[in-house]
Amino acid sequence: MGGQVRVAIVGAGGRMGRTLIEAAYHQEHILLGAAIERAGSSLVGVDAGELAGVGKLNVIIMDSLDYATDDFDVLIDFTAPDASIVHLDWCVRHKKAMVIGTTGFNQAQKIQINAFAEQTPVVMAPNMSVGVNLMWKLLELAAEVMGDYTDIEIIEGHHRHKKDAPSGTALKMGEVIAKTLGRDLEKCAVYGREGITGERDRETIGFATIRAGDLVGEHTAMFADIGERLEITHKASSRMTFANGAMRAARWVVEQKPGLYDMQQVLGLN
């Protein structure tokens, strides 16, 4: 991965967008080529570096990718499902690689992403933290050893502004555990409990969601038996961990053939 990779960041004015700009500034092998905000945003025309608090970068926030076609190699997108689909379509038409950190896609949108990825390289992951991706590997081992005789619960917490629940990371945790145990998550997942629920079914995987304050992201998988329980927890204290992972993915994906990849592949954990 020699030389600099030029990245464009959409949703540049949001919390994650500003963190991505800061991460790009601090990474030796990354060059911020473009920063995009929605049409009509008051941030259009602002210097991206000044917005992110790293000083002037001479990268002016624009309101369309069409103005930046020649300025970047990889698009980084942590926006919203509908917007990400539009951006991916643009990347296919302009032969750009893409890193997607957006969560909350429905099944139809996932099918669209798979189809688009046949024409351009895409890394998509619900969480780009190195620690979270290692946690998924640990969950495989825990499920293999303890999953068939323990009650499995997944608890996640995020800031009050997060729009989807459970988080994409929590759902991925459930998918990893269910796949390891030969279960179908759509059939065994229980999302919240209320009222008289009856005795717990050992085959289920429970999900609990917290939305409060400025929690960046906390995820715990509990394997509970009589007399003991194992908890595997990841806590993010800053969005920078996700941004740094996205930069790592950008450097990696630009050298790949068309296809849909995840952070496990970026990190060599597969």
Curated annotation (Swiss-Prot):
GO terms for biological process: diaminopimelate biosynthetic process; lysine biosynthetic process via diaminopimelate. Pathway: Amino-acid biosynthesis; L-lysine biosynthesis via DAP pathway; (S)-tetrahydrodipicolinate from L-aspartate: step 4/4. It catalyses: (S)-2,3,4,5-tetrahydrodipicolinate + NAD(+) + H2O = (2S,4S)-4-hydroxy-2,3,4,5-tetrahydrodipicolinate + NADH + H(+); (S)-2,3,4,5-tetrahydrodipicolinate + NADP(+) + H2O = (2S,4S)-4-hydroxy-2,3,4,5-tetrahydrodipicolinate + NADPH + H(+). It holds the Pfam family DapB_C. Its EC number is 1.17.1.8. CDD domains: DHDPR_N. It is found in: Cytoplasm. One of its GO terms (molecular function) is NAD binding. Disulfide bonds: none annotated. (S)-2,3,4,5-tetrahydrodipicolinate binds at residues 159, 168-169. The active site is at residues 158, 162. NADP(+) binds at residue 38. GO terms for cellular component: cytosol. The keyword Cytoplasm applies. Keywords: Amino-acid biosynthesis, Cytoplasm, Diaminopimelate biosynthesis, Lysine biosynthesis, NAD, NADP, Oxidoreductase. Its main location: cytoplasm. NAD(+) binds at residues 11-16, 37, 101-103, 125-128. HAMAP family: DapB (MF_00102). Catalyzes the conversion of 4-hydroxy-tetrahydrodipicolinate (HTPA) to tetrahydrodipicolinate. Belongs to the DapB family. This is 4-hydroxy-tetrahydrodipicolinate reductase. It comes from Shewanella putrefaciens (strain CN-32 / ATCC BAA-453).
